[in-house]
Amino acid sequence: MIRGIGVDIVKVDRINEKNVQKILSQKEKEIYDTFKGQKRKKEYAAGRFAVKESLIKCFKRFIPYSQITVLNKQSGEPYLDEESVKYLFEKFGGNGTIHISIAHEREFAVATAVVIDED
């Protein structure tokens, strides 16, 4: 059963170094630091922020951004790491799967999250 669907859009230019420290998990910061240009760094952080805001809409409760880690498969497909999924279902109850998607278009990053309860 679908528990929640969330969508968020972020203007990439809103991202600055101060919010990056609040938005990204430790693992995400390590990946962020490997990018050379500011444009790519901002796009990366904006996409992660949009995912985390989408998850807040799914669960209808605030989630500390740094508790959630968004990674990418070899194919580029984004996913939540296992610890993040476990954290969310332990904190808010239930058991299931979380699907996410991120897209970038010009100055925007948009993300969608779908939480499916299997209980």
From Swiss-Prot:
Its localization reads: Cytoplasm
UniProt-listed GO biological process terms? fatty acid biosynthetic process
Which positions in this protein are listed as binding Mg(2+)?
Answer: 8, 53
Which keywords annotate this record?
Answer: Cytoplasm, Fatty acid biosynthesis, Fatty acid metabolism, Lipid biosynthesis, Lipid metabolism, Magnesium, Metal-binding, Transferase
| Entry cofactors | Mg(2+)
Its Enzyme Commission number(s) read 2.7.8.7
Query: According to its UniProt record, which reaction does this protein catalyse?
Result: apo-[ACP] + CoA = holo-[ACP] + adenosine 3',5'-bisphosphate + H(+)
Taken from the UniProt entry, a GO cellular component term is: cytoplasm
Task: Please indicate which superkingdom the organism of origin belongs to.
Answer: Bacteria
The terms under GO molecular function for this entry are: holo-[acyl-carrier-protein] synthase activity; magnesium ion binding
Please give the Pfam families that the UniProt record associates with this protein: ACPS
Family affiliation = Belongs to the P-Pant transferase superfamily. AcpS family.
HAMAP family recorded for this chain? Answer: AcpS (MF_00101)
User: What is the documented function of this protein?
Assistant: Transfers the 4'-phosphopantetheine moiety from coenzyme A to a Ser of acyl-carrier-protein.
Task: Report what the protein is called.
Answer: Holo-[acyl-carrier-protein] synthase
Source species taxonomy: Bacteria, Thermotogati, Thermotogota, Thermotogae, Petrotogales
